UniProtKB/Swiss-Prot annotation:
Biological classification of the source: Bacteria, Bacillati, Bacillota, Bacilli, Bacillales
Keywords: Cytoplasm, Protease inhibitor, Serine protease inhibitor
Organism: Bacillus subtilis (strain 168)
Gene: ipi
Ranges that cross the membrane: none
GO terms assigned for molecular function: serine-type endopeptidase inhibitor activity
Key word Cytoplasm present: yes
Record's keyword annotation contains Cytoplasm: yes
Name by which UniProt lists this protein: Intracellular proteinase inhibitor
Any one annotated GO CC term: cytoplasm
InterPro entries documented for this protein: Intracell_prot_inh_BsuPI (IPR020481), IPI (IPR038144)
């Protein structure tokens, strides 16, 4: 999903016993963008079923460091990250919502939503 200067994309891949999510944040601006994080958590990922019931949340039962961190993306640079849902739910249509937790000056929070099929 676009956010003027950065684009967040999601690719959901069904594997035999899990769903893998590959995500990519691309700086499409002409300048470097510095993101600040207040914890070690770089993103949140939530999967919903067709009734909008939450089925998976990346941060559930995880602990993150409480340390400030920075990430600088140069113009044209991409930051790739991933997560694995160690379950294959029943067949159907699901929605994944990813929120990039980094904050940058003059940018809204970066999010993307995408539907995917489980067969």
């Amino acid at each position: 999903m676009e956010n003027q200067e950065v684009v967040l994309s999601i690719d959901a891949i069904q594997e035999p016993e899990q769903i893998k999510f590959n995500m990519s944040l691309k700086n499409q601006s002409e300048r470097a963008i510095e993101f600040q994080f207040s914890t070690g958590q770089k993103f949140e990922l939530v999967v919903y079923d067709s009734e909008h019931k939450e089925r998976y949340r990346y941060s559930k039962e995880k602990m993150f460091t409480q340390a400030f961190q920075n990430l600088t993306l140069e113009s044209g640079e991409t930051y790739d990250f991933s997560d694995v849902w160690k379950e294959v739910p029943e067949p159907g249509t699901y929605e994944v919502k990813v929120t990039f937790k980094g904050r940058a000056e003059n940018l809204k929070q970066v999010q993307a939503v995408q539907q995917f099929e489980v067969k």
